[in-house]
């Protein structure tokens, strides 16, 4: 009589949800497989049947005898026969598409039933289970955002990203078989998303738009809109010395002004201080004490922008050689 007092076995929500999840994945895979098969079958049938029928009609028309006495009637009959054959091929293509659509609708109905069953189990789970156990199961098997919500969020993210093209906001039209033929003849569209690399942040892995056509995503420098992190190759801040020399040569007047300011600061008026550093030449005659004549100082020619040889290196070298030749006794006292 022990079986009479046994408790009723509780419903296993976790196992049932696992089983439904596997069935949902199989149903979704079946839908994707049917759609891809439909596109391949229709494309191959359209191209192959039309090419074979056209070649066969051309061979038959060239080798067949005149059906009517008037040649114009014969041409009209062959053209009408060709059009009738093309129409029959199109009707057969429509029948194939209808059969694939029936399979696709049946698979979608199965997916809809599985989703409804999963929703019922989730509703029962919310009313029976404890809070923490329910929360864990809902996070694992809860319903994901719908397709419409995903499209709205993707559109808002594309508008907020400055690098994304304006063509991505336009509605996507289904690609037909003649679009593929034109892409093979003319070339792919440069603005298409399939021909441009996505900018994925290396830190938070968020989408930051698309790179330009022909440009690699690893060569694009940008700041992530979500984590504000820097992405792309680092910027080389060091400049070569040739660029610095060219910048100095473009403004020689500033160099001459800096030289004058340095000479005024180092040489001050005093009884034992000379006004400017001079080189003492042994061959120069010694002035007598009684004579008060003073030799006029030659005006120093400042650097001008017209002199082609003026550069920062030449000015600094000449200044240091003159300063080094002055005796220590003539240096200004503080």
From Swiss-Prot:
GO molecular function, one term: zinc ion binding
Tagged with keyword Membrane: yes
UniProt keyword tRNA processing, yes or no: no
Location of this chain's protein in the cell: Endoplasmic reticulum membrane; Golgi apparatus membrane
Coiled coil: 12-42, 99-127
Regions crossing the membrane: 41-61, 79-99
Source taxon at top rank: Eukaryota
Low complexity bias locations: 253-270, 297-315
Lumenal side: 62-78
Residue ranges, annotated region (Disordered): 237-315
ZnF (C4-type) residues: 201-227
Biased composition (Polar residues): 239-252, 273-283
Cytoplasmic side: 1-40, 100-334
A cellular component annotation (GO) from this entry: endoplasmic reticulum
Biological process per Gene Ontology, one example term: endoplasmic reticulum tubular network organization
Topology relative to the membrane: Multi-pass membrane protein
Record keywords: Coiled coil, Endoplasmic reticulum, Golgi apparatus, Membrane, Metal-binding, Phosphoprotein, Transmembrane, Transmembrane helix, Zinc, Zinc-finger
Modified residues (Phosphoserine): 284
UniProt main location, coarse: endoplasmic reticulum
PANTHER family the record matches: ENDOPLASMIC RETICULUM JUNCTION FORMATION PROTEIN LUNAPARK (PTHR22166:SF12)
Function per UniProt: Plays a role in tubular endoplasmic reticulum network formation and maintenance.
Homology family: Belongs to the lunapark family.
Protein name: Endoplasmic reticulum junction formation protein lunapark
